[in-house]
């Protein structure tokens, strides 16, 4: 069985999506076989920001459940930076409250928020946002709780049911005016109706208000753990530091390998004619590399590299251009080794 052609499965990603996969080709995370062992897939993504707190995550598995509210990306990143600088930083000072992509408003209670941040458990209420159009005597609802499974159509049906049941008498009409500019449910009011009191009634009787129950249950090293926000961010920081360490090792090895090749090329520069003579006078192809090794005191890897150079490139100009990178590579290697030796540099 093969996967579908890319035209059926491809998706256009926003630029920030690149941060999910950044440096994935530099051994930053482990790869395992996919379901049929035909290719490799990452066990985790080397995401450059704490995505677990930026996306609204809810799910149920065997014997466990998870419900993680989303937060503002800028606030999450700022909080993470402050925690790196100061492990005793108060999370609530920079991470004000949950922030849902669909909008709506939260009845803010700092004590409740801090309890959720500390334990990873708790709940809060979300309310639809509205404005009152006095000239047309109507309420425009522009944001609904993202936690609700209700759509604008089902909300309208619920309101109509309440009107028919006699629970709501202040509404003369309700309609869906949602368009490309965004969601909009318009409620026409009867004369003399207080819009704020009506909305309080709608919050009680319809899905225009909802609760979000937090259960920050995540898998850490394959085991489920309920964690507070600070603990979660510290766990992500440790993960990201490991990604940086692995990326640095990858870059360091690549730089050292390249420097090693250029060191061999540098020796050839001392006597290009000798290199050409060795190649020309060698009777069998298999003997070219050993003869270069003997002639210039280089190892097999360096000799293989030199032997693969085209004849037209065996000139002083070409070799000088290549060996000019040696000084930059030495500086890069020193910088990378400093990063590996210093946790502070890795965090930066």
Regions found by a protein language model. Give the residues of each.
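C-terminal interaction appendages of subunits in large macromolecular complexes
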Residues: 4-7, 11, 15-19, 24-27, ...
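Helix-hairpin-helix/helix-loop-helix acidic hairpins
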Residues: 26-40
């Amino acid at each position: 069985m093969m996967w579908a052609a890319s035209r059926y499965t491809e998706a256009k990603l926003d630029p920030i999506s690149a941060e999910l996969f950044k440096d994935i080709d530099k051994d930053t995370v482990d790869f395992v076989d996919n379901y049929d062992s035909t290719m490799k897939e990452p066990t985790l993504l080397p995401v450059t920001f704490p995505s677990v707190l930026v996306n609204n995550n809810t799910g149920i598995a065997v014997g466990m459940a998870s419900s993680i509210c989303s937060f503002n990306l800028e606030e999450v990143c700022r909080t993470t930076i402050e925690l790196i600088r100061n492990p005793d930083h108060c999370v609530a000072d920079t991470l004000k409250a949950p922030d849902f992509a669909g909008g709506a408003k939260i009845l803010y209670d700092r004590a409740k928020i801090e309890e959720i941040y500390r334990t990873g458990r708790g709940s809060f209420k979300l309310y639809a946002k509205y404005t009152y159009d006095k000239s047309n005597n109507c309420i425009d609802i522009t944001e609904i709780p993202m936690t609700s499974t209700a759509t604008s159509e089902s909300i309208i049906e619920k309101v109509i049911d309440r009107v028919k049941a006699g629970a709501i008498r202040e509404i003369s009409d309700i309609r869906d005016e949602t368009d490309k500019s965004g969601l909009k449910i318009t409620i026409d009011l009867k004369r003399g109706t207080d819009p704020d009191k009506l909305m309080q009634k709608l919050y009680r009787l319809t899905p225009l208000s909802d609760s979000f129950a937090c259960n920050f249950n995540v898998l850490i090293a394959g085991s489920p753990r309920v964690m507070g926000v600070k603990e979660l961010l510290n766990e992500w920081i440790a993960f990201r530091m490991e990604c940086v360490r692995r990326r640095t090792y990858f870059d360091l090895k690549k730089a050292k390998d390249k420097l090693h090749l250029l060191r061999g090329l540098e020796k050839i520069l001392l006597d290009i004619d000798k290199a050409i003579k060795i190649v020309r006078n060698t009777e069998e192809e298999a003997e070219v590399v050993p003869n270069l090794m003997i002639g210039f005191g280089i190892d097999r890897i360096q000799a293989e590299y030199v032997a693969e150079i085209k004849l037209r490139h065996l000139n002083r100009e070409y070799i000088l251009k290549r060996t000019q990178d040696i000084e930059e590579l030495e500086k890069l290697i020193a910088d990378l080794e400093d990063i590996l030796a210093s946790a502070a540099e890795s965090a930066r």
